[in-house]
Amino acid sequence: MYSLSDFDFELPQELIAQTPLAERSASRLLQVLPEQMTDRNFAYIVDLLSPGDLLVFNDTRVLKARFFGIKETGGKVEVLVERVIDQRNVHAQIRASKSPAVGMRIRLADAFDVIVGERAGEFYELQFPDDVFELIEAHGRLPLPPYIEHAADAYDETRYQTVYAKTPGAVAAPTAGLHFDQALLDALTAKGVKLAYITLHVGAGTFQPVRNENLAEHNMHSEWYTISQQTVDLVKATQVAGGNIVAVGTTSMRALESASQSGSLQAGSADTRLFITPGYTFKTVTRLITNFHLPKSTLLMLVSAFAGYDTIRAAYQHAISQRYRFFSYGDAMFLTRMPPC
């Protein structure tokens, strides 16, 4: 039985990537097998996949979800939209010296007022005066992860989105997908690798460390996903033909496994709190492309469950010694599912 301290590691600060590389597919790729680590360029992913394999991407689009504002009492606030509920309402985190009262107005971006509603846990309901997506796009700022030290600029607005981002709703990018450019997608298709898409709106909880030493006590954050019947059909056809189901990122993995709890993948939409730790039996995904994750994070636990705890520990030690770039703008790994015990 693993505990929180088993997922801690020391990372030199200079290995946290602060900016993306000039070319998406120029990142490094660590091919990981038990007791075998191979350093590759990310474009080599074409050679690691076979005709008939299926790549499953998350097509969520990152919202410009960060706002700075002023309460009607004059106090400064920072707002991070966590989830769009409907056309006029959102759930959001609010940072302020004093918690805002229900009914209070907050002026955001010196452009429009929102009204504070009820609080549930760490989130407030906020009512927007007009279409949420239009106001966010016009006045919000891209919410870069907390370990990136610069404010988002126009370059980030392009590079912190995947080239196939389509469905707005995330507050963090599905970062494994950032390595794919159109030329690489075309090369994969030309080889006979199939492409499919799910949507999972990544929440701010993805950056939160687990705080309970006993992992069973962790309250997993919730994220919304949807999987189409078309994607389900592609997955099942690939499985029948003996191809690999390759999740592009932990968010695609989480959606696919959440929708497979009955034993086989089902189409539909739902909120998921699936917390994958070592001992979990994977039902759909056989390969995983993923970036390097934060210490004590749920994502580090997920990849340890998938490829094996000792294998991941060795991979991270190798990556640090070889000066791989870590986290959202960093390099990637190609993982194979550990055989069930």
From Swiss-Prot:
It catalyses: 7-aminomethyl-7-carbaguanosine(34) in tRNA + S-adenosyl-L-methionine = epoxyqueuosine(34) in tRNA + adenine + L-methionine + 2 H(+). Pathway: tRNA modification; tRNA-queuosine biosynthesis. It is found in: Cytoplasm. This is S-adenosylmethionine:tRNA ribosyltransferase-isomerase. Monomer. The keyword S-adenosyl-L-methionine applies. Its EC number is 2.4.99.17. Belongs to the QueA family. HAMAP family: QueA. One of its GO terms (biological process) is tRNA wobble guanine modification. GO terms for cellular component: cytoplasm. Keywords: Cytoplasm, Queuosine biosynthesis, S-adenosyl-L-methionine, Transferase. GO terms for molecular function: S-adenosylmethionine:tRNA ribosyltransferase-isomerase activity. Pfam families: Queuosine_synth. Transfers and isomerizes the ribose moiety from AdoMet to the 7-aminomethyl group of 7-deazaguanine (preQ1-tRNA) to give epoxyqueuosine (oQ-tRNA). The keyword Cytoplasm applies.
